[in-house]
């Protein structure tokens, strides 16, 4: 599975117990979002405030995502439903 497929799988399988908000990091910018919709190769992110150009929605290709920051105060164990596990 390549990186783009991993990001797509993460967004497709985002659990209801974890708020659909965060900050997507691309090589060009950091994009805060409060919700999203997915497609085969793209994700549309919804901002709570417009950017400097007035845009509230941003469409990003999965292969352009470098990282995802999550502001959630949930304990790490809650993220196991996203496929994460403690090291052995």
Placement of each model-derived feature along the sequence:
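N-terminal recruitment modules of adaptor/scaffold proteins
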Residues: 1-55
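Intrinsic disorder/low-complexity detector
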Residues: 1-6, 79-88
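Short acidic, Gly/Pro-enriched loop/turn segments at secondary-structure junctions
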Residues: 52, 69-84
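Phosphoinositide-dependent membrane-docking surfaces
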Residues: 59-69
């Amino acid at each position: 599975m390549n990186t783009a497929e991993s990001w797509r799988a993460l967004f497709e399988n985002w659990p209801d117990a974890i708020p659909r908000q965060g900050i997507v990091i691309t090589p060009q910018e950091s994009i805060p979002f409060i919700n999203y919709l997915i497609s085969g190769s793209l994700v549309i992110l919804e901002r709570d405030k417009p950017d400097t150009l007035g845009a509230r929605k941003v469409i990003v290709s999965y292969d352009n995502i470098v990282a995802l920051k999550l502001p959630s105060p949930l304990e790490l164990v809650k993220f196991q439903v996203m496929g994460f596990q403690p090291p052995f």
